[in-house]
């Protein structure tokens, strides 16, 4: 039975480490699916499974646990950054600026409440432990990792701050969802009215491609080429088909328009009225009845060399006599403006003869198999640059130690930049949603399992004989006070839609369980929009905040 003894208890055995992690992750993920009052902890339960195993003496070599913890965290934050990168900078436009400002308010108030409790209690809770409680209260795991990284820089040897995190986390989830419910009852929210208001708001802000058939009835443009008209009008549109004297063909910039010519036009909704008024009138045309065999087909961009190129640079109209009318990216239709930058994973609508469309397909790739192949080089180039970025010391006046983004902040920043600007460096940033989610989940469960196993030895003693209940109470106050204050301000002063506010609260705390609750409460996508708008900045600030507190005050 020596083999079993070695498998279960030898902390230096590779088999023991793998066996322990496999059990902790499997048990944690399974138990995390159990719903309590309609809310499940999800993969976060892996932390508690790790604590349980650590409490009973199952552990591993400290250096191995540390490596797995940090590598898991790197994978997690990098995949998050890669996913939110394209929307990070655009989230500051229009209403996104207000939402992000409110999210910053929540982050600042969380820190203010935590520091107030720290001074009120007169140092009964050590500063590193209070930071752990802060991150448990706001359910932000990457921030905990960044704080631990900062403590490593300071050679901290006190109690595991993950104990404070684990104590505060459960009521943190409850408090976030509770604040969402509280705001609903404070303002007596009518779900049906909120959904109607949201639909009215989004109808006016979504710039989808507008398709229409027009008949030429403006004497001023008779005999003019399509290119001349487009330049004079100054509003971008695509004319994919023209019916002239009963014959349907594909027009180009040199096509001359005459009276009663019929055009199939694609443009943005806000430009449609001006284009109709300038060309003639809108008519109903059956474009299926044609004497020239033409097809409309969505073609997948899969060739890396197309990544980052402007649509107009490819000259499809002049080279292949086809028109591209719209581009679908991540489920959203975009107007095919010549300045639109194509990315791997885009689906372009091509109109032309079947032979020409096939030639365009060969240029763009149109290979689903190629799209499903993992772009490993982008992942590891990004991690390499992220660690380099995270290791650079940034000196601030008055701070005893330079700040570093660390193993959490560095990869996150680089991933956001690659997600947004990677196509300009011809880096293929496209990853299937399932692949991104798989890597992300593997990363977070490895991190949580490591933190739990390391903290487990002292957890029960801390809760029963130590200040565990005090940690829980402090965590709940850190959670609930800022959310109620900002929730009331957002609703009463800024008139934020309640469903959007749900996403704001969940996103500012980077809390998936709260988002899941919000999505269940409404059929609208408003919570997801609010969540994704504030998530990148909130995550970035959460990761930096703990480091700044520790480096400034220790």
Curated annotation (Swiss-Prot):
CC annotations in GO: plasma membrane
Location of this chain's protein in the cell: Cell membrane
Domain called RCK C-terminal: residue spans: 198-281, 282-366
Signal sequence interval, chain numbering: none
InterPro entries assigned: AAE_transporter, RCK_C, RCK_C_sf, YidE_YbjL
Gene3D superfamilies tied to this protein: Regulator of K+ conductance, C-terminal domain
Membrane protein topology class: Multi-pass membrane protein
Pfam families, per the entry: Asp-Al_Ex, TrkA_C
Biological processes, Gene Ontology terms: potassium ion transport
PROSITE patterns listed in its UniProt record: RCK_C
Keyword tags: Cell membrane, Membrane, Repeat, Transmembrane, Transmembrane helix, Transport
Membrane-spanning parts: 13-31, 36-58, 73-92, 99-121, 161-183, 376-395, 405-422, 442-464, 468-490
GO molecular function: monoatomic cation transmembrane transporter activity
Similarity annotation: Belongs to the AAE transporter (TC 2.A.81) family.
Name of the molecule in the record: Uncharacterized transporter BF3802
